[in-house]
């Protein structure tokens, strides 16, 4: 729902940014690669203009804007396709969804016309903590090093976990 996306991603960031400014604290805002339209066919860099297509992406870009407008010392970290084992809530992510689907013998359809940089959650957490504690400010891409389609990721997951890649 558009209203809740903006309430969480823009208004929430604005509220936190205001409190951080009042207390002199640095805000590290976690954003997304979805702020780009994905048509480039290669890795995006921090200095490239955003062109969000979805309500979610537009709300995240607004969250970035209010974060950076609140203080020149704030940091925006963009991540992409975050994955890992979520032992606390059991909530799935793209990689665990692929594993679960293939283990159940379900055929899945994955697109190959958009590239993403999958990001291992523990690595992202470590990197973002280091960046937040340092002097970096502005926008930083903190995604993984690879640039792959979701189809490619699915095939790698199937191969890694010895699952039936023909279901992809």
Where are these regions (language model features)?
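Conserved internal alpha-helix within the Rossmann fold of NAD(P)-dependent oxidoreductases
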Residues: 13-16, 64, 128
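SDR active-site strand-loop-helix element
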Residues: 27-32, 37, 77-79
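Active-site "gating" loop of Rossmann-like NAD(P)-dependent oxidoreductase/epimerase domains
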Residues: 33-53
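NAD(P)-dependent short-chain dehydrogenase/reductase
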Residues: 65-116, 122-123, 129-130
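Active-site helix of classical SDR
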Residues: 59
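Helix C-cap/helix->beta junction micro-motif
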Residues: 19-23, 70, 161
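Mid/C-terminal beta-alpha module of Rossmann-like enzyme folds, strongest
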Residues: 127, 131-168
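NAD(P)-cofactor binding segment of oxidoreductase domains
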Residues: 1-28
């Amino acid at each position: 729902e558009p209203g809740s996306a903006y309430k969480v991603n823009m208004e929430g960031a604005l509220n936190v940014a205001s409190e951080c400014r009042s207390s002199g604290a640095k805000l590290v805002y976690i954003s997304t690669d979805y702020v780009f339209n994905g048509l480039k066919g290669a890795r995006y860099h921090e200095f490239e203009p955003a062109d969000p297509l979805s309500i979610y992406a537009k709300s995240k870009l607004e969250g970035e804007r209010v974060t950076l407008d609140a203080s020149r010392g704030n940091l925006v970290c963009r991540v992409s396709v975050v994955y890992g084992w979520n032992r606390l809530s059991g909530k799935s992510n793209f990689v665990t969804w692929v594993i679960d689907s293939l283990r159940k013998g379900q055929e899945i359809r994955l697109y190959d016309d958009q590239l993403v940089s999958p990001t291992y959650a523990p690595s992202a957490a470590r990197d973002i903590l280091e960046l937040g504690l340092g002097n970096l400010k502005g926008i930083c891409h903190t995604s993984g090093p690879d640039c792959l389609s979701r189809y490619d990721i699915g095939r790698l997951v199937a191969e890694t976990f010895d699952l039936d890649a023909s279901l992809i």
